[in-house]
Amino acid sequence: GEVPLTCMELSKGEEKKQLIFLQRHHNHGAPSRPPHMIEHRANIRALFDAGCEGVMAVCSVGAIPEDFPPGKVALADQYIDFTGHQSTFHDDAALFTSVTDPFDSELNAALEAVLRTAQDFDAKERMRYTYWLAQGPHFETKAEIDAIDTLGGHMVGMTMPREVKLARELNLPYAAVCISSNWAAGREPGNASQDLDHHSVSSQANRRLAPVWACMLHLLTM
């Protein structure tokens, strides 16, 4: 189907840059599309066909380690996807894409510097984490989060790795800015039985957009 893109042109003196915004949960005016129903192939292909030179994804995640509290904004440098969901443009021909390092190193380095400055973090602050892809649309159980922690996941979400796989197939540089919007199930300090609420999660993410804007503005000057 059609993919709605918002195109903007920013200028500074004689220099002009174009920014294309895509809401991954777009649903043609209806309520947001649930994560397991997002048409990732259409979204990434639309960005590629629009001539994007790179992608800065913004993700709301549930955090597992103590050094990634709600409100902190960091980066993904690896992902783990055991969902069994296929994300590829190559359904007919056997083509195999390397994702040893799935995220663009140049973009991540630039964004890490911006995020440190925007949040007053020193050089010791950890800024890169492993994203665990959950099937969704349900949040995880405490037992699932414990297992994810054991297997090396630091944050959980329901979308992003499906995008970066497709971007890699198109050689489209991709970075993921991740907003810790909540503690993952069972990790709320002092209340391991705290229920997760979608609206509270979204509200926390929306309150932490300033570092995200700083990243975007920096990329437009690169």
Where are these regions (language model features)?
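Short acidic/polar active-site loop segments enriched in Thr and Asp
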Residues: 53-54, 154, 173
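Non-catalytic positions within long, well-ordered alpha-helices that form the structural scaffold/packing
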Residues: 48-51, 149, 168
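Mid-sequence, gly/pro-rich, charge-dense loop/helix-turn segments that line enzyme active sites
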Residues: 58-145, 150
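His/Asp/Glu-rich mid-to-C-terminal helical/loop segments that flank catalytic regions of hydrolases
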Residues: 184-222
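Zn-dependent metallopeptidase/amidohydrolase metal-coordination segment
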Residues: 158-198
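Metabolite-binding pocket within alpha/beta catalytic cores that recognizes anionic/polar moieties
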Residues: 1-99
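Generic hydrophobic/aromatic pocket-lining and core-packing "Φ" positions
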Residues: 44, 145, 161-164
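Short, flexible loop segments at the rims of nucleotide/cofactor-binding pockets, characterized by
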Residues: 31-36, 132-136, 153
